[in-house]
Amino acid sequence: EPDFIAAWYSTFSDKRLGDVDFWHERSVGTYMALNSGCRGGSGTYQQTVADECQDILTLGMIFDVQDRAEALVAEIQGELDNISPYLADKDRLTVAVLEDEGGTYRVYGEDTLGGNVATSGGAELAVGKHGDNGNISAEDLIAANPDAIFMVWYNGYTVNDTDYAGEQVVELITENPAFASLDAVKNDRVFAINLNNVYCSGMRTLDGVLDFAQHLYPEL
């Protein structure tokens, strides 16, 4: 018997918690994360770090902890303000943010939060530009040849029934002979990143930005 539910748009589907009206009729408040699809897919609305900050501020108002919410958003903005001048006179490293779906690779492109977190952390996207967030093949990845690859994982993540939840997700790239020629492989720039840091990341948004910034520019 909750008083309030904060969740993704998909959480309020018929197969899960049901429509928000069901809860409102029972005096239960609800909030959907802006980047979870409640306004439409990433192809309709660009998902941004700014949206995550707005979620934090809105929830801060709902729970009457505005000062804490504002401090967290200020911390995120402060780190972004540190990263931008550092990169002003540098060529950004090209990056692919991918999720292995067993033969093809989901792209976290520029319209997705993952893509926006990556660029906020100093990446230049090698794939997923101009709203093209469709899956890519191994051949597409080889042709793009990014400087670095970030492989997305989450708890329970498997590929072909093998557990790749955690740092071992990089092996999907580094242990695949087809990718031996990739600059990211040759230069040890294949990294793991948790889905929580690149999708509806909320309070973990800064973790995501720093994941990219610190891996790509360790001297930062």
Set out the residue ranges of the language-model regions:
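Acidic/histidine-enriched, beta-strand-rich ligand/metal-binding domains
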Residues: 125-132, 140, 144, 148-149, ...
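Internal, well-ordered alpha-helical scaffold/interface segments
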Residues: 57, 74, 112-119, 139
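Acidic/His-rich segments in extracytoplasmic proteins that coordinate ligands and/or metal ions
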Residues: 1-62, 137-178, 214
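Alpha-helical, coiled-coil/dimerization segments enriched in small aliphatic residues
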Residues: 107-134
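Residue-level recognition of alpha-helix initiation/capping sites
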Residues: 13-15, 50, 109, 132, ...
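Short acidic/glycine-rich loop or secondary-structure boundary segments that cap or lie
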Residues: 103-107, 116, 158-160
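Short, conserved, surface-exposed binding loops centered on an aromatic residue
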Residues: 85-90, 117, 140-144
